[in-house]
Amino acid sequence: MTPAGPAQLLIVALVVIVLFGSNKLPDVARSVGRSMRIFKSEIKEMNKDQIESSDQTLKN
């Protein structure tokens, strides 16, 4: 699968603008950013818990 070219990115951008409207785009982008930060922090916590759990298992 090849990376998206400029034409594909332009089409996606136009579809997003049509779906959400230009007034809501900043809010949508902000929400996506927050969601990504939360998701990343949860993944880090899961990995941390998994490492701690495996350390406990190895000690026993």
Swiss-Prot record:
Membrane topology of the entry: Single-pass membrane protein
One example GO MF annotation: protein transmembrane transporter activity
Gene Ontology biological process: protein transport by the Tat complex
An annotated GO cellular component: TAT protein transport complex
Keywords: Cell membrane, Membrane, Protein transport, Translocation, Transmembrane, Transmembrane helix, Transport
Highest taxon of the lineage: Bacteria
Transmembrane segments: 1-21
InterPro entries, alphabetized: TatA/B/E, TatA/E
Role played: Part of the twin-arginine translocation (Tat) system that transports large folded proteins containing a characteristic twin-arginine motif in their signal peptide across membranes. TatA could form the protein-conducting channel of the Tat system.
Xref: HAMAP family: TatA_E (MF_00236)
Quaternary structure (record): The Tat system comprises two distinct complexes: a TatABC complex, containing multiple copies of TatA, TatB and TatC subunits, and a separate TatA complex, containing only TatA subunits. Substrates initially bind to the TatABC complex, which probably triggers association of the separate TatA complex to form the active translocon.
Protein name, entry field: Sec-independent protein translocase protein TatA
Upper taxonomic lineage: Bacteria, Bacillati, Actinomycetota, Actinomycetes, Mycobacteriales
